[in-house]
């Protein structure tokens, strides 16, 4: 998803 909030997704 989002790079900052969900760096793995």
Swiss-Prot record:
Protein name (record): Putative acid phosphatase PS18
Superkingdom: Eukaryota
General remark: On the 2D-gel the determined pI of this protein is: 6.1, its MW is: 81.5 kDa.
Native organism: Pinus strobus (Eastern white pine)
């Amino acid at each position: 998803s989002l790079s900052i909030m969900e760096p793995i997704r």
